[in-house]
Amino acid sequence: MRPNLSLSYQQHTAPFAMRLLSSLFALFLCGAFAIAPLQGQRKAVFDLNKALQRFEQQVKKGVAITFTLTSQGTKPQEGYTWLYGRRFMLSMPGMEVAFDGSTLRIINQSERTYTLMTPSEQDLTAMNPLAYIQQTSQRFRITERKSPRGTVVYRFVPTQGTNVLAGVKYYEVTFDQQSQAPKRVDLYFDLGEQVSYTIHKIQPKEHITSQSFTFAPQEYKSLEVVDLR
């Protein structure tokens, strides 16, 4: 049976991000940022288009990100991911995820499984939070929200007829006003749950090869292999 990587994301992220993260990549559902008209954007102070384009360029070259995942009723979890175009590697306590552009590989230590699958775009979106930053903005109604000093917050609400974020009512991205870098991603689910990713560091990821997005046999040799391709 194909695992459900969307909907009630929080239930699966609890112990070890079982729900298999957002981002993340995600990912990389977007190759270009076609920005829809923004409601209430302070263009003279902050340019959302430039902020998104800057992040996209970082991802194209390879970027490493450390973050903290928090959700209701669970302890905060530290995570690490690096993104390279559509490909990504994600590390959380008890779980490792890799996507090489075609095959999604998941090591789940709590269930002692190594899963391989050909993911849908929704599967990828459910895996990596930072993917939401890269979503094609034409699919969303974007509004600026009230924000703490030194930051800018935008809410992204899927337009009618789109189903990119299955189970997600809307999400918000907080940017640093000076550096224009994303600082936080908050996902608000239809059932009332909220999952937040606080980004601590974004830096270039060097020495990326094709082997960066897969696992060596010794990493999963003691696990049950579940091949869903």
What would you call each of these model-derived segments?
Residues 60-66, 84-90, 149-157, 179-186:
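Short, hydrophobic/aromatic-rich segments at coil-to-beta transitions
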Residues 69-71, 92-93, 108-109, 186-189:
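Beta-turn initiation residues at beta-strand->coil junctions
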Residues 23-34:
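Bacterial N-terminal signal peptides
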Residues 78-127, 195:
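An acidic-aromatic
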Residues 32, 36-75, 86, 218-229:
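N-terminal leader/targeting segments and the immediate start of mature chains
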Residues 119-150:
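Flexible, surface-exposed loop/linker segments and immediately adjacent secondary-structure boundaries
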Residues 41-42, 148, 159-170, 177-229:
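Non-transmembrane domains of secretory- and envelope-associated proteins
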Residues 1-18:
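N-terminal secretory signal peptides that target proteins for export/translocation
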